[in-house]
Regions:
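Glycine-rich flexible loops
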Residues: 1-140
Length: 140
């Protein structure tokens, strides 16, 4: 199960987390999945430390998707595959579980936050990401 946490995935996660223009606070989230197992950055950990610290927690992806549909309490604690692991899954676990891409890198960049909260955000994103598989989620 740990074989998903490759050095390349950890390096990607750490590099994103170490760039202050791409991250705010603990740095967003990365996840990697195969079949029903998904590893995601744990709540309260820092993405920048992905290469040196145990910041990822394995969850049952189907159980996380069920939480999005109202099963469970929404914390995704019940989806954790290792009952001894004290790490809590990210609050955005259900979002990552719903996406079919094997790797999801989700950051909180300053520029993206500015554009997403701007009335021009959607058209700018559509122009910049034309032809790419991207989802625009308006800033809440």
């Amino acid at each position: 199960m740990h074989d998903l946490l490759t050095p390349a995935f950890r390096t990607l996660s750490a590099r994103l987390g170490q760039d202050p223009l791409r991250v705010q606070g603990p740095g967003g989230n990365t996840s990697i999945k195969s079949n029903d197992v998904m590893w995601i950055k744990a709540s309260g950990t820092e993405l920048a430390n992905a290469e040196s610290d145990p910041i990822f927690v394995a969850v049952d992806r189907n159980a996380a998707k069920a939480e999005a549909e109202g099963a469970g309490d929404g914390s995704c604690k019940a989806t954790v595959l290792d009952p001894v692991n004290s790490l809590r899954p990210s609050i955005e676990t259900t979002f990552h579980a719903a996406l079919d891409w094997p790797v999801v890198a989700h950051t909180h960049s300053i520029a993206t936050s500015v554009h997403a909260s701007s009335p021009e955000g959607r058209p700018i994103a559509q122009e910049k990401l034309a032809g790419l598989p991207a989802i625009f989620v308006p800033y809440a």
